[in-house]
């Protein structure tokens, strides 16, 4: 999970707002594609892990929170936006991971489209 977080932070450097959020989302999926079986392990660790795994997961949430807050959206809705974003990223990864192994470019593109659509709604509602 640490490596995944580092990769997500790296792709966000120098990017802003929607672009950074989309790149981080795709990098999350990329990591799962490149490391079969890790997604399931991460989910188990988040649910049953230690204080250390909780800290690592919270670093992931902190990155997304920072990116959300950089978007000049309603600050009072940050947690609500974070929940929508993580729900989309995790849900999409869960449902599409099997397809991603055989058609990774298609799945990456479709995740980017899903995130774009979500962000359009978020920016319309919470700006």
Question: Residue ranges of each PLM-predicted region?
Answer:
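Short amphipathic alpha-helical/adjacent loop interface patches that line ligand
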Residues: 1, 25, 36, 61, ...
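Solvent-exposed, amphipathic alpha-helical segments
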Residues: 3-11, 88-95
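Amphipathic alpha-helical packing segments from all-alpha helical-bundle domains
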Residues: 5, 47-73, 79-83, 109-120
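Hydrophobic alpha-helical connector segments
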Residues: 6-37, 75, 82-85
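Amphipathic C-terminal alpha-helical segment
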Residues: 38-44, 87-104, 119-127
